[in-house]
Amino acid sequence: SYFYSIGKPKKNRILCIKNSFHGRTLAAIYASGSKKMTEGFGPKIPGFSHIAFKDTKPRFPKIKNKIKKNTAAIMVETIMGEGGIKPIPDKCLQYLRKLCNKKKILLILDEVQCGIGRSGDFFAYERSKVKPDIVPIAKGIGGGFPIGAVLMNKKVASGMTPGTHGSTFGGNPLAMAVG
């Protein structure tokens, strides 16, 4: 939505870590890059490229080659859950932020599983001093009640004009009170 809103509709690919976990919707399972997650679901959702977790050490050596003209964002779990409890090193998060700034793409740090105090910090990314553009959160805000939110900076929010994003259950009063 952000790149579309600024006249760059072809900038729509997201680079993710293979075997990550970003949810169970059709697009989210393809973001995972995991055959286990996508087997039996189709057609394949385009728009995702992947790097292996090992390429996060020490400074994502292969990631530069994966960023193309149509890359819109890099999305990583700050602490990988499904692929084993593997925190992304602070230096790697810092490198990703610098790389995203240089390439003029967004940094999405998925904190659905590890955010809201579950890592010892309010957000796991805070220890790295990195400021992401987008932060999906969920499990920690509802204490077991189904609720989620997507936090974003002003620049990204400027692309979220009325009618560009919606949810069947969005804004549920009980969920909002619990969260």
Predicted regions and their residues:
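Conserved N-terminal phosphate-binding loop of PLP-dependent enzymes in the Aspartate aminotransferase
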Residues: S1-G179
